[in-house]
Amino acid sequence: MKWLFLLAALLLAGCVSAGPAGGSLDSIARDYVKLQLAIGEKEEGYIDAYYGPPKWQAEAKTAPGTPAALAQRAGVLAVRLSSLADGRLDPIERRRRDFLLAQLKAASTRLAMMQGAKLAFADEAEGLFGVRPELKPLSAYDPILARIERLVPGAGPLADRVDAFQERFTIPRERLEPVMRAAIAECRRRTAEHIALPANERFTLEFVTGKSWGGYNWYKGDANSLIQVNTDLPIRIDRAVDLGCHEGYPGHHVYNALLEQKLARARGWVEFTVYPLYSPQSFIAEGSANYGIDLAFPGDDQLAFETRTLYPLAGLPAARAPQFLALHRAMQDLAGARFTIAADYLDGRIGRARAVELTRKYQLYSAVRAEKSVAFIDQYRSYVINYGLGMDYVRAYVESFGEAPERRWAAMESLLSGPTLPSDLVVP
């Protein structure tokens, strides 16, 4: 693949122009953080979170360097890391080194893209997130559509029927905040029963508009998050628990808080004070956040909580709640279709209008929601694999520890608290 040769060339250039090679993991980690901050000056949104020394951020703003120069710096750091032989490192240090190498590969890939490299969707996903997605033909999802047809019978296009059914479960705007806060509180309660959260952890909830995403966690450091919920489109009641777990507990908020507590603070690993969005770390973040919903609400727990608490708060009748949740779960099996649509669209095999049309058919979205979904692909590209594929990886790993809830939660906490890479989740 052409991009691999490009990365090799960047590494070679780094070797030729390198300063001192080797060094300790701590010194390499400091240079890594400064490099990531400098890359962040070249692309808005590249840095998802930073809570390290303000001085380093100021330095990056003053003299970030060109993408080519930053690529050379990434190559130098990769060489320095590779010079640290296994025999010199204990097991946790080897994991730390491997994590840094994987993050640097992603940074080099993104820098290559900034310089005009055109990568195929699967190559881009592998370069940025450390996993090569399987892209099934869309026809592979037709049996799932047939199953959903039986859940929502009637005339007209299936996407229209699904959307009309789901609209009955829209949370009124004036009731949205109490519903969301109740959902987040329950997600937190269930998580705290199994994971010891930092004593000062907290979040702020905001409602926003004008975004391509539905929810976002902006981690501020000191166990503090800003959770934003986008209200461009009506929010259905199933999204309350989904967002509460995904953005909060045991999702992004808990993941970032544990990394800060266990690695950045307790071990002094400064590389965890910066979170580059386009990196294997996002595969872990999105996958664990999505799986965290099922972990926190196993079996019929979500349905019971929603009908007991959320439906009354939203002022919605709960008579058809079981059918609504069954539809929601069936539609999750269509997640992989989004990868195929994104790949065909970004690789130029279909145009935008066709991508919207296929999103309507294979994600069962209204026209407006399909447009929003493709807008997300426009902005974040191969990042879309992290949700469904990441969840599959995390689920397989956590559930390999057995059916006992305490064992699954312990596996989840370990996953969230360490320098975990996608390759660590591969179950033999």
Residue ranges, per PLM feature:
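Bacterial N-terminal signal peptides
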Residues: F5-G14
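N-terminal maturation segment of proteins
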Residues: C15-P428
